[in-house]
Structure formats: structure tokens, C-alpha cells
């Protein structure tokens, strides 16, 4: 629990330009941490086999229909783009007047319901588009409260996803202070700066998630063995460093070269975001084909890899037991 005095010290006045969105958060935020800001516990713990668990992460799940489609396709984690608006948090990638999907509260209710019905949904990755937004009570505290009231009691863990450019903001500093055993923090970017950010902020290795990718990784894939900026190289360096609890790549679509998909998996990524490049998730033959590609590699390597289940804890170094 973080003290109110310490929390207020994070929230110094100053205008915050919201990245990737025309929305501007007001200066001088005033966030209050609820008194019942606790860590729900509804997680099972059962050792699996020694094969490494792999997360198949549905991309841009912005509607309740997208939740149902992704879980029906076999996704075991969901990536939800999150944008704050004056009237609430929404599943929204672009932050435009016509781009919002469902309210986050409704999305979380749907995910929790599916999890309680037996769906394999290990965690929700919150891709935070304007994490420092703060208006009408819509701020990072209210978002985390939704996670802890709706997702976590159902057994769904949470990944708070930031970009390297957002790590100096109020939201990042708040989240890192109050992470519970069901939550982790992710930074997307290049390996070396991300590793330095995590070290500087004193975040435990098992709570660190490094991600690297491109809307089409083929455009800057690299050789996987070079020291350049290619996506595959960044992922390989992240895994070999042992500086992160998990390493995820993105975005695999029906247009991604099959050999590139396989190479990302061969360097040891713990999961891949898959789906459409520029649209929200829904049932479509292209998405189903992408899943077949990823699962094809898993089938060929079943002695060493398997799809993660709800019993696998992504925020544990062993990945097989709850914290």
C-alpha cells in the first residue's frame, strides 16, 4: 500500500501531453487511492509438465464480441488497447471520436465471466495509450481499481503495458509502487534502454515484461543473430539477458512470413501477439490462419513447448505456480 502523502508527491503539477491521442490531461492531477485497494486472490497452483508455457495473445481486443472470438479461437491472453476519455476508460487504439470500442468495465466483466465459465485466459495486457490521463476521476488509479475488482478476483492476471517514452510519467511511477502478486509491468521498446529503465526503477525481474515488435515485423526483422535494431535481434537479446520475467513479440498476422514467425519462437519468446494489423479483433479466416501457423510450430515442438493454461503464472520465474 502506498501512502496518500507519497502518492501526492508523484503528482506534481504540469501539463501532460497524451501520446497517440488528441486528448490532453489536465495539470495538477489529484488521484486518491481507495481504502480497500487490496490484492484479490483466486488463483490455482498446479505444476504442469516441464515444457515451456507459451502465450497466444489476441491483438486489439476492443469489444465483448472480440473477447468471445479470441477465446473461441484459443487465445490464452488478451491485449486490450486502453484510452481514457472524459467519461471513462475504453477499449480504444486510436483515441479518435469514432475509434472507441466497449467500455473497459464491460470488457472486464465479459472476460471475468468467460474465465469463470472455464475459458483459458491467463492475463490481460493493457496497452496504455494515454496512461497519464486524469479527468473526472478517470485516471490510472480508477483503471487499476477496475482490474482488482473485476479481473483479478476471477483469476485473471494483469499486465500494465507502457512504452519507453512513458516511463517518466505519473502513471508508471504509481503502478510500479503498488503492483501486487497478480500484476506485472511491461515496457515496449529496444532491449538496452528498456533494461536500463527497469533497473533504474528497481522492479523485480519476475515482474518485468519486455516486448518488441512492429505492425509488420517483416519490415525490420533482422537476422536474429546480428547486433542491429531488428525485431528478432531485440527479442533474442531480451531472452538471453535473463533480465526480464517474460519477453513477448508482436504483431503476427496472416501477412507475416511464416519463417519469421518461427524464428521469433525459436529465439525463445514467451508469447506472441497475433491478429489484424490495423483493426479490432473479430472472427475472420485470416486470424484463424495466423493461429494455425503459431500452433503448427508448437505442435512440432511439443516436447519443449506447450500452450499456457490458467495454472501457469506468467509473473513467476518458474511460470508454473502462483506467487
Swiss-Prot record:
- GO terms under cellular component: extracellular region
Leader sequence segment: 1-20
Q: What class of enzyme is it?
A: hydrolase
Where along the chain is Mg(2+) bound? 79, 81, 127
Reply yes or no: does the keyword NAD apply.
Answer: no
The free-text domain remark for this protein reads: The SMD-tail motif is highly conserved and may be responsible for structural stabilization.
Q: Which reaction does it catalyse?
A: a sphingomyelin + H2O = an N-acylsphing-4-enine 1-phosphate + choline + H(+)
Motif: SMD-tail; annotated at 308-315
Where does this protein reside within or beyond the cell? Answer: Secreted
Q: What protein name is recorded for this chain?
A: Sphingomyelinase D
Keywords associated with the record: Hydrolase, Lipid degradation, Lipid metabolism, Magnesium, Metal-binding, Secreted, Signal, Virulence
Please list the GO biological process terms of this entry.
lipid catabolic process
What GO molecular function annotations does the UniProt record carry, in alphabetical order?
Answer: metal ion binding; sphingomyelin phosphodiesterase D activity
Write down how the cofactor binds this protein.
Binds 1 Mg(2+) ion per subunit.
This protein's cofactor list reads: Mg(2+)
Q: Which family does it belong to?
A: Belongs to the sphingomyelinase D/phospholipase D family.
Query: Where does the protein principally reside?
Result: secreted
Q: Which domain of life is it from?
A: Eukaryota
Biological function: Catalyzes the hydrolysis of sphingomyelin. Sphingomyelinases D are produced by some spider in their venoms, but also by arthropods such as ticks, or pathogenic bacteria and fungi. They might play a role in pathogenicity through different mechanisms, such as membrane destabilization and host cell penetration, but also pulmonary inflammation and cutaneous lesions.
* EC number of this enzyme: 3.1.4.41
| Enzyme active site | 59
What is the species of this protein? Trichophyton rubrum (strain ATCC MYA-4607 / CBS 118892)
Amino acid at each position: 500500500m502506498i501512502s496518500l502523502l507519497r502518492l501526492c508527491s508523484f503528482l506534481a503539477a504540469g501539463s501532460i501531453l497524451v501520446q497517440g491521442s488528441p486528448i490532453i490531461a489536465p495539470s495538477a492531477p489529484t488521484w486518491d487511492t481507495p481504502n480497500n485497494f487490496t490484492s484479490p486472490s483466486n488463483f490455482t497452483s498446479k505444476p504442469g509438465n516441464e515444457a515451456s508455457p507459451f502465450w497466444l495473445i489476441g491483438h486489439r481486443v476492443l469489444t465483448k464480441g472480440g473477447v468471445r472470438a479470441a477465446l473461441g479461437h484459443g487465445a490464452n491472453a488478451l491485449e486490450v488497447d486502453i484510452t481514457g476519455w472524459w467519461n471513462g476508460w475504453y477499449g480504444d487504439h486510436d483515441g479518435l471520436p469514432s475509434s472507441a470500442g466497449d467500455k473497459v468495465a464491460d470488457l472486464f466483466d465479459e472476460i471475468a465471466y468467460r474465465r469463470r465459465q472455464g475459458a483459458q485466459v491467463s492475463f490481460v495486457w493493457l496497452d496504455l495509450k494515454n496512461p497519464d490521463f486524469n479527468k473526472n476521476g478517470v485516471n490510472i488509479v480508477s483503471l487499476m481499481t477496475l482490474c482488482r475488482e473485476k479481473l483479478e478476483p476471477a483469476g485473471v492476471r494483469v499486465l500494465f503495458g507502457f512504452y519507453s517514452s512513458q516511463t517518466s510519467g505519473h502513471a508508471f511511477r504509481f503502478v510500479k509502487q503498488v503492483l501486487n502478486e497478480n500484476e506485472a509491468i511491461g515496457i515496449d521498446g529496444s532491449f538496452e534502454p528498456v533494461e536500463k529503465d527497469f533497473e533504474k526503477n528497481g522492479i523485480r525481474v519476475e515482474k518485468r515484461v519486455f516486448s518488441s515488435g512492429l505492425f509488420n515485423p517483416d519490415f525490420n526483422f533482422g537476422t536474429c543473430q546480428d547486433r542491429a535494431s531488428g525485431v528478432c535481434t531485440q527479442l533474442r537479446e531480451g531472452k538471453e539477458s535473463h533480465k526480464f520475467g517474460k519477453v513477448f513479440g508482436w504483431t503476427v498476422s496472416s501477412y507475416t512470413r511464416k519463417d519469421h514467425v518461427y524464428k521469433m519462437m525459436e529465439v525463445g519468446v514467451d508469447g506472441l501477439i497475433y491478429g489484424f494489423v490495423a483493426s479490432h479483433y473479430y472472427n475472420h479466416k485470416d486470424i484463424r490462419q495466423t493461429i494455425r501457423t503459431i500452433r503448427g510450430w508448437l505442435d512440432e515442438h511439443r516436447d519443449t513447448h506447450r500452450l499456457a493454461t490458467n495454472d501457469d503464472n506468467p509473473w513467476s520465474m518458474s511460470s508454473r505456480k502462483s506467487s
